[in-house]
């Protein structure tokens, strides 16, 4: 199941409109591409069935091959509130978000992950509710300007491994 979408924004005018919604962080307007990870607002039967039909058609399998799996998911999500369904979808979007950051690093593209933005205002600007979506995270992509980026020459600081990782043996 892939209960989220990625919206790619390269239009400078639209990025300028997003900037105040995202605390005027310069990466919004300076990026070549801004990705918005937006999760489904709820996990309804229609969306799940459409996704499963697509998966099975791509695998050349009959749709009824694993109906028990789909029914189990329907039963599970039927017990969730709309808010719980959204939170599940948002967690799935975060997994994709992490993969996008790793892919950008592999390609040598600078990436700035962001959660500091007004989600409701961004959703309204991009008309996400009309698509059954809610914004989760932003990922600004591009190449940093080594001359003007004050962080470029500073050491990247992360917790030492022995403080970050808890080993249980």
Task: Label every PLM stretch briefly.
Residues 1-91:
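Glycine/small-residue-rich phosphate/adenosyl-binding loop
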Residues 6, 71-125:
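Small-aliphatic-rich amphipathic alpha-helix that forms the alpha element of a beta-alpha
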Residues 9-10, 38, 114-116, 141:
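Short His-Asn-centered micro-motif
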Residues 12, 41, 117-120, 145:
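Acidic, glycine-rich active-site loops and adjacent beta-strand->loop/helix elements
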Residues 27-32, 36-40, 128-148:
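A glycine-rich helix N-cap at a beta->alpha junction
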Residues 43, 134-169:
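C-terminal helix-cap and adjacent tail motif
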Residues 124-130, 153:
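Short proline/glycine-enriched turn/loop segments at secondary-structure junctions
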